[in-house]
Amino acid sequence: MSRIAYIISAYKDAPHLARLVAALDDRADFYVHIDLNADIHPFEEALGDKVTFVPRHRISWGGWEQVEYQKELLAAVLHSGIPYTRVVCLSGQDYPLWSNNAIHRYFEEHQDTEFIGGFNLTRCTVKQQLHKITHYHPFRDLPWKSIWWKNKLIVASRKLVQILPIRKAPFAPLEGKQADVYFGSDYWAITLPCARYVYEKLCTEEKLVKYFRTSFVPSELCIQTIVFNSPFASKGLLLEGEYPGLTRLTPLHYIDYGASIRVMTLEDLPVLQQSGKMFCRKIVSGTSDRLVEAIEPVSYTHLRAHE
């Protein structure tokens, strides 16, 4: 029987996280990271023993600590000793559009597929995208209490880096070689062997870690680079050609990307129903309640009928 490990990051809205866990609680276990900047008590009260909480990291968007909490979650899954068939990475503001039976059946039918998008950034001709790795992006993980001063420092350093002739190579050191860097969404669903491979590389490839510590949003780069330079590469979802954008690189989620991710409301229901996606984001308690109540999870039979 298939069993899924859901690894989830959250920093607010404990009631919705409890709702998400309840919706997916079928042949599944939940491993949760709560940002150290947040109060964990509402999450403990809302979830109790329904989830496994992992050691916490202080998260700054776009910083290396986002990869560290993913590593923490993978460690908990692997050390559990449970032979999961799939490890699914979610945020605490996701919600399923499919029934649990449909999710399990779909993964069973695609048991060798690694649902992680990848685009070769090393070969990319769009300078703005290439700068994610060739420009240094320091200071994002500084544990400053003043977000205002921290953001000022980040912006100033970014402008300085654009002026100074200091660049990183568009290759990441991996297994003693210069590996192409791949970019994709940090929400994915990979097999347990692939998850183990990723975790081992995060533990042993010190030069790789050092390289990505100063990259822009390494959670969209590091694990993708490991997978697409691994024996699992042919099973991943590689996009070639022109830069496709993050929407196409997010295989299982419907997300309205923009300057910031848009909160979903009842008005988005028709689009979500037609998207064919397994999950949606961003769901917020209060604002999205009517949408969640209106979602009728897509059945496995419905999926097969529309293939």
Predicted ranges, named:
Residues 20-29:
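Short, acidic, metal-binding catalytic loop of nucleotide-sugar glycosyltransferases
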Residues 28-55:
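Acidic donor-binding segment of Leloir-type glycosyltransferases
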Residues 301-307:
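Conserved small/polar residues in nucleotide/adenosyl-binding loops
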Residues 87:
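Short aromatic/hydrophobic "clamp" motif used to bind/position activated sugar donors
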Residues 150-261:
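Catalytic core and acceptor-binding pocket of nucleotide-sugar-dependent glycosyltransferases
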